[in-house]
Amino acid sequence: PLRLVGSEMCIRDSINGFHGDCACTIPCGEVSEEARKLIAVTRQSFYEGIKFARKGNRISDISNAIQTYVEAQGFSLVRDYVGHGVGANLHEDPEVPNFGRPGHGVRLQPGMTLAIEPMVNVGTYAVKVLPDGWTVKTADGKLSAHYENSIAITEGDPVILTFPTDGENW
C-alpha cells in the first residue's frame, strides 16, 4: 500500500466540489530520440486541438486538429479512450475524441469545461487492458504518451485551468 510521508506532496483533484483533470508523460533517465519526439508531438497535439476550442466550434473540430497533427508526424491516436467534460464529476459529457471529421458533435459554448487528452502511440492505435483491469498497454507493445489539461470555453480564447498559478508550465 502507498503511504505518504510528511515531506511528500500529494495531488488534489477537486476544489469546492469541482474537478480538474491533467496528466503528462515525462522522460525518466535516458530515453530514445523516438520517445522524446513522441512526448513532444503528444504535448503539441493538445495545443493544436485547443486552437479550435472556441465558442461556436464543434467538439470534432478539436478532435480533427489533434488527429491531423499527430498523423502528419507519423504517429497514431488511441481510440478507445477519449477526453471528456469535467465539472462536478471527474468524467462528464460530452466525450472529446482525439480523432474524427470536423464539424460534428456538440457546439462549444462559453462556460463549458473540457479535459482534452491526446494519447499518442508509435505503432497501432489499438490498446489492451491487462488482467488487473486498470493497466492499459499498446496492443503492439510500442511506446505511447499522454498529455492532458482541463480547459474552459470562453467568449474568446480557451483558458487552461490546470496550469500552476506560479507561472510554471509542464
Q: Where are the predicted features?
A:
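Residue-level recognition of short, solvent-exposed, well-ordered loop/turn junctions
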Residues: 3-4, 54, 109, 146
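Acidic-aromatic/histidine active-site loop/patch
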Residues: 149
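Conserved, well-structured core segments that form or line functional sites
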Residues: 14-20, 27, 31-115, 119-125
